[in-house]
């Protein structure tokens, strides 16, 4: 299969293709607080404002919705079918996104550390 997209890995400068770039892009979207980019104030997610809140079922739902809405708005290459969260005892949180790559129909499953 030929890559439809070539980009650059932010950490080592090497070439990345389709799914690698989508993963990098979604990580950036979720970790960027809304309002923090000067020329694009609405870019990012509301996730940063929720990270240190008390653990409740309502907060977990808000986190999932914040992730889903940010990816829906800023990453048109994927369609999500589920968003799940997991927190470890040391306070780290990961978000697992499952869905489909829109161009190829290929299933997509990404686990992204967000804290």
Swiss-Prot record:
Coiled coil: none annotated. Induction: Expressed in the late phase of the viral replicative cycle. It is found in: Virion. The keyword Aminoacyl-tRNA synthetase does not apply. The keyword Glycosyltransferase does not apply. Signal peptide: none annotated. SUPFAM superfamilies: gpW/gp25-like (SSF160719). InterPro entries: IraD/Gp25-like. One of its GO terms (cellular component) is virus tail, baseplate. It comes from the Viruses. GO terms for biological process: viral tail assembly. Keywords: Late protein, Viral baseplate protein, Viral release from host cell, Viral tail assembly, Viral tail protein, Virion. It holds the Pfam family GPW_gp25. Belongs to the GpW/Gp25 family. Baseplate protein that is part of the outer wedges of the baseplate. Probably plays a role as a connector between the central and peripheral parts of the baseplate. Plays a role in tail assembly. This is Baseplate protein W. The lineage of its organism: Viruses, Duplodnaviria, Heunggongvirae, Uroviricota, Caudoviricetes.
């Amino acid at each position: 299969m030929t890559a439809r997209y070539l980009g650059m890995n932010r950490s080592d400068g090497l070439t990345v293709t389709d799914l690698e770039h989508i993963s990098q892009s979604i990580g950036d979207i979720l970790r960027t607080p809304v309002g923090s980019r000067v020329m694009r104030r609405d870019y990012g997610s509301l996730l940063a404002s929720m990270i240190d809140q008390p653990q409740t079922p309502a907060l977990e739902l808000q986190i999932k919705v914040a992730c889903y809405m940010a990816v829906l708005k800023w990453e048109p290459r994927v369609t999500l079918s589920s968003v799940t969260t997991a927190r470890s005892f040391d306070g780290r949180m990961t978000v697992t996104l499952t869905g489909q790559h829109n161009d190829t129909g290929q299933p997509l499953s990404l686990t992204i550390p967000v804290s």
